[in-house]
Regions:
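Heptad-repeat coiled-coil alpha-helices
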Residues: 24, 28-31, 61, 68, ...
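Helix-loop segments that flank and shape redox-cofactor active sites
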Residues: 1-3, 18-43, 105-120
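Conserved alpha-helical segments that form or flank metal/cofactor-binding pockets of metalloenzymes
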Residues: 33-72, 142
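Short, contiguous alpha-helical
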Residues: 123-146
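Generic structural signal for well-ordered, non-transmembrane alpha-helical segments
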Residues: 9, 13-16, 42, 46-53, ...
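Disorder-to-helix initiation segments
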Residues: 1-11, 81, 88
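Non-transmembrane, amphipathic alpha-helical segments
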Residues: 3, 7, 40, 91-94, ...
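Acidic/histidine-rich alpha-helical segments that form the ligand environment
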Residues: 53, 57, 76-126
Length: 146
């Protein structure tokens, strides 16, 4: 059912893109707060990575194929690719913005699943929303200027 599959694939692509960007930042962060950002980005990318395979399996459970090529994922995602190495603070700010996009796409997929009574999928997506709300909290706290 395309009404579920289309937003589900977008949410998957946004999740995968956020995972890649977060790991990229984890590898390349520098500066006086290196360790704190390195650990924060590591915590986030590990959690998001853990969702990639179950997300793909949810797409397969809908009798669709999970997107797997970088070309297709880049067509689906709203997250902008990173080609530079920004400051640690800018990394956290960009991840917060990207996480907001993931929250939006997961909510859209959840709403579609709910509309069609796909309760198991709704539960999975609600769990994803909870995790991304926690990531938003961590990132907001890391960039807050006291």
């Amino acid at each position: 059912m395309e009404e579920i599959i289309t937003p589900l694939k977008r949410a998957f692509a946004d999740t995968f893109a956020m995972y890649l960007k977060t790991q990229y930042y984890h590898w390349n962060v520098e500066g006086p707060d290196f360790y704190q950002y390195h650990e924060l980005f590591g915590t986030i990318y590990e959690e998001v990575y853990g969702a990639v395979d179950p997300f793909a399996e949810q797409i397969r459970a809908q009798l669709a194929y999970a997107p797997g090529s970088f070309k297709r994922l880049s067509e689906l995602t709203r997250i902008v690719d990173e080609e530079t190495v920004p400051t640690a603070l800018a990394m956290a700010e960009r991840l917060l913005a990207d996480n907001t996009l993931v929250l939006m796409s997961v909510k859209e997929a959840r709403d579609a699943a709910d509309k069609y009574g796909e309760n198991g999928l709704v539960n999975f997506l609600e769990d994803r929303l909870d995790n991304h709300k926690k990531h938003a909290w961590f990132l907001r706290s890391a960039i807050k200027r006291v």
